[in-house]
Swiss-Prot record:
Taxonomic source organism: Azotobacter vinelandii
Gene3D superfamilies: Dinitrogenase iron-molybdenum cofactor biosynthesis domain
UniProt record, GO biological process: nitrogen fixation
SUPFAM superfamilies (UniProt xref): Nitrogenase accessory factor-like
Source taxonomy: Bacteria, Pseudomonadati, Pseudomonadota, Gammaproteobacteria, Pseudomonadales
Similarity remark: Belongs to the NifX/NifY family.
Protein name: Protein NifX
Keywords: Nitrogen fixation
This protein's encoding gene: nifX
Length: 158
């Protein structure tokens, strides 16, 4: 299993609960330039319609391109809580495992700028999210318990 060799957290992050966590497979924290399974690092950002901020960076040691899926488990665990991971490619097994924990893999062209991807995501959040993003937002908010109050106010007729 590939354990991270280094995991850095931003300590002064101001997450007020409105930030969606999004990961980027990036070697330099500026460009998406890695395949998910062989990614040597992830930059994880918090994003909402108005702002974004770096939350953490996870770096891994050398990984072999051997088809061994054990190396995926730790990466997928580290992305739990993210709504998406942007990468240059993602194998079918990794896609299934990511989707099972609610992380949407998003394939982008190698060299896509993280700042531009975040900006596009913010525009989508402001103008109306796509289906996958709307579901991700709902999952992060949890069930709306106010619906029971509305039902109680209507009363029962038997």
């Amino acid at each position: 299993m590939s354990s991270p060799t280094r995991q850095l957290q931003v300590l002064d992050s101001e997450d007020d609960g409105t930030l969606l966590k999004v990961a980027f497979a990036s070697s330099d924290r500026e460009l998406v330039d890695q395949h998910f399974g062989s990614s040597r690092s992830f930059a994880i950002y918090g994003v909402n319609p108005e702002r974004s901020q770096l939350l953490s960076v996870v770096e891994f040691g050398e990984l072999e391109q051997d088809g061994n899926e054990d190396k995926l488990a730790r990466k997928i665990d580290l992305l739990d809580g993210c709504v998406a991971v942007y990468c240059c490619a993602c194998g079918a097994s990794a896609v299934r495992q990511l989707m099972a924990i609610g992380v949407q893999p998003i394939k982008v062209s190698e060299g896509a700028r993280i700042a531009e991807l975040i900006e596009a995501l913010q525009v989508e959040l402001r103008e109306g999210p796509s289906a996958w993003l709307a579901k991700a937002i709902q999952r992060t908010r949890g069930p709306d318990m106010r619906r029971f109050d509305a039902m109680a106010a209507e009363g029962w007729d038997e």
